Amino acid sequence: MLISDVQSALDFMVTVQYKTGCNRIILNKSAIGEEFFHLSTKIAGEILQKFVNYRVKFAVVGDFSSYASESMKAFILECNRGKDIFFLPDEEKAVEKLSTV
């Protein structure tokens, strides 16, 4: 697991920016702790706000159909309507989306 809390997300993001100069990141959902996907923990909001604050576009790829919570479904839908954070089914769609924002 690469991202388990706000600090690990921030460390990851800053390292990618420093080493590559890139401000668009794609990450498989398996690299993110399961707590992220339970909105009651507020971890997702805190982590994603860091990406927005640092002006880094971020896509999480994977199958999100197992999350039955209406609030999680609404959260994913709302993110996908924006221009900073995306939850997409695969890397190809993520590259396509991040190249247009």
Model-predicted segments: where are they?
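Amphipathic, Lys/Arg-enriched alpha-helical "gate/interface" segment within cytosolic domains
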Residues: M1-V101
